Amino acid sequence: MKTQVVQTALITGGGSGMGRTISLQLCRAGMRVFVADLDLAAAQKTAQAGHGLPGRAEARGVDVSQSTSVASLFSDLRQRTERLDLLVHTAAILGQTVSIEDLDDEQWRRMMSVNLDGAFYCCRQAVRWMKTHRSGRIVLFSSVASLTPTPGALPYSTAKGGVNMMGKTLAQEVAGYNIRVNMIAPGYVDTPMLAGLPEGFPDYILKKTPLKRFGDVEEIAGLVSFLASPAADFFTGQIFSPNGGLVI
């Protein structure tokens, strides 16, 4: 069965980086976009940047690591629109580079709560809603670090690997409801999060990347637009990794 044309989208982590660019690109395509972020002011700036575009952008605050916050967000959205056609979950944190023997419980739990629990909470609410109109698309952001070992980033890689398997399993569970679930595992993209990498690491990555550059946020947003389009109707449970050839 074909999915409905995407008209309403929720972007988590839409206040900056890839989430911001995706929000504006979808708004440019005429969609109604809810921009959600822990930093409400940043989400509001994204929404303001969408003024004058064919679509409509609205800002919301959310802490994806808290199930009650996510539930409150979806409750609010349900009062404002009849359906949710697209969830794009980009909200995430990087954390510090640390070896397992120096990794404390709080660091581990924080990484899991934002990067894995957050995806689960958002997917659970989205599926409950999408099932009512038997159509929808979910795009979960993992990372190239979920596809290859990244020493020093054990909790991050583990959480993002969990996102991939959650998405694959969910894709099979909800296919009968005409819901598609796909993952994007970006390589190193030119966003503010690059500043959080250890000194010298970006140069190391460039040397290892066959295309010798970082990704551009517009390239990632273009992939999301494709996955939201009728052209991607036969895609579900797949991991797409734009990474410049870093992992093949």
Question: Model regions: which residues?
Answer:
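C-terminal substrate-recognition "lid" of short-chain dehydrogenase/reductases
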Residues: 120, 213-242, 247
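Canonical Rossmann dinucleotide-binding motif of NAD(H)/NADP(H)-dependent dehydrogenases/reductases
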Residues: 2-34
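Residue(s) in the substrate-gating loop at a strand-loop-helix junction
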Residues: 143
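Active-site loop immediately N-terminal to the catalytic Tyr-X3-Lys motif
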Residues: 101, 148-154, 176-177, 212, ...
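Alpha-helical segment proximal to the catalytic Tyr-Lys
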Residues: 128, 172-176, 233
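Substrate-binding pocket helix/loop in short-chain dehydrogenase/reductase
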Residues: 98-100, 104-109, 194, 205
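Active-site helix of classical SDR
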Residues: 123, 159, 167
